[in-house]
């Protein structure tokens, strides 16, 4: 936690080591513990949240902004419900984007690529 206290950017990866806790729940817990403003969620092969699975539905459309409530209501498979509930209650946003090396720098410098999930 010294790095956070010094204003450094910290990247958390992995799980909690507890059964029944997904990596989504782990990310939500770490975000709460460290008073994060936003979670950066890099996805493999998809560049944000879509109205349907873009790999199987050609009519799927990228959603630029969506709420946690809408994700749960529409049963979009972005994250597990426990993590979504924790983050919604805490007003922590998520930026979902495609996991490419060049995208990390773009996102942390303010690029609005992908999807923003808000309260």
Identify the function of each model-found stretch.
Residues 1-119:
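C-terminal catalytic "cap/lid" subdomain
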């Amino acid at each position: 936690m010294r790095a956070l206290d010094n204003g450094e950017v910290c990247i958390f990866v992995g799980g909690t080591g507890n059964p029944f806790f997904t990596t989504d729940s782990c990310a939500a817990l770490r975000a709460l513990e460290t008073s994060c403003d936003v979670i950066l969620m890099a996805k493999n092969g998809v560049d944000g949240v879509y109205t349907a699975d873009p790999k199987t539905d050609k009519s799927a459309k990228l959603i630029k902004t969506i709420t946690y409530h809408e994700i749960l209501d529409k049963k979009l498979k972005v994250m597990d419900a426990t993590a979504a509930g924790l983050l919604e209650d805490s007003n922590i946003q998520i930026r979902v984007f495609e996991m490419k090396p060049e995208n990390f720098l773009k996102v942390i410098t303010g690029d609005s690529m992908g999807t923003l999930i808000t309260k």
